[in-house]
Amino acid sequence: MIIVLSPAKTLDYEFESNHDHSVPAFLSQSSKLINILKTKEPKDIASLMGLSDKLATLNFDRYQSWSPAKKVSADSKPSMLVFKGDVYQGLQAEDLNNAEMKFAQKHIRILSGLYGILRPLDLMKPYRLEMGTKLETSEGKNLYEFWGDKVQKNVLNELKVQRSDLLINLAAKEYFTVLGKLPEDINVVTPTFKDYKNGNYKIISFYAKIARGLMAKWIIQNKVTNFEDLYGFDLDGYKYSKAESTATVPVFLRKSKEPDSLNFLTSTISSNDASLFSILAVIASVISF
């Protein structure tokens, strides 16, 4: 079984890791992309990625100083511990013990515009390159054409080694698309999370992202490898709904409560990792209840 996740824009390198580390599978391809990005001025980066001048300059500096990392350093640490976006608030990788991290290393994969695919302990340097970026390379006009079938082959080979056909999709469409058209014998399962709002259950993006991380954590901690076992996921008030689900899209429902949202907002604001977007999303969700 392989679980795929999206990366995050928010990164944190201010931690010490006692875990082992590994090296990304496609460092040579990453270097090719960086060499292209190194030729671009901050204004070009801002235009290409829709960034502010400040963020464009930050990433210009990142590209100029980037080099393939094979050792832990202040700016080269395990990927799943570095990412701190909404999904990773749910995952809380920093709390995993060695046995849990070993399970994650085998089963979790993070899709990446720069690295293609990352294992949790693969060393990663700070970067910004979303999969949907229309960066022209010798392989084509965007990153999907650059990566071609490399990422898919990597995942399929790993499933073959594990003698499994189960692929759990906890990634955003922008990233999952890099896997292309998968063989029909691969069982792709896409868990969906809905919260009760204004009289109906619906997908609330901010909560759904956190729920993806929660499910990843739950799978790791319970060492789940069978599809049917996913039905037992019950963290943070979510419950499996047989009536709402299909064979490939298990749906989990939660009747959100305003006090819980307010408590989460308080903890989010006090966290150094919280992004302004995440905070505003919680405020909007709370007000609308």
For each predicted feature, which ranges?
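N-terminal beta-strand-loop-alpha-helix module at the start
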Residues: 1
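Active-site helix-to-loop segments that bind/position phosphate- or nucleotide-bearing substrates
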Residues: 4-95
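Short, glycine/charged-enriched secondary-structure capping and boundary segments
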Residues: 19, 182-184, 267
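Residue-level signature of transmembrane alpha-helix interfaces in integral membrane proteins
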Residues: 22, 132, 185, 279-288
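Alpha-helix boundary/capping residues
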Residues: 37-40, 222, 277
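Internal, well-folded beta-alpha domain core
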Residues: 93-246, 251, 255-260
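Low-acidity, Ser/Thr- and Arg-rich intrinsically disordered low-complexity segments
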Residues: 261-281, 285-289
